[in-house]
Amino acid sequence: GLFSVLGSVAKHLLPHVAPIIAEKL
């Protein structure tokens, strides 16, 4: 379903977004 797609996308984006968030914090 839609949520499973969003979940898989989030798992792919998290490794890239986490370092950016860490730098802002």
Curated annotation (Swiss-Prot):
GO terms for biological process: defense response to bacterium. GO terms for cellular component: extracellular region. InterPro entries: Caerin_1. It holds the Pfam family Caerin_1. The keyword Cell membrane does not apply. It is found in: Secreted. The modification Leucine amide is found at L25. Expressed by the skin dorsal glands. Keywords: Amidation, Amphibian defense peptide, Antibiotic, Antimicrobial, Secreted. It comes from the Eukaryota. The keyword Secreted applies. Belongs to the frog skin active peptide (FSAP) family. Caerin subfamily. Caerin-1.17 shows significant activity against Gram-positive organisms, but is less effective against Gram-negative organisms. This is Caerin-1.17.
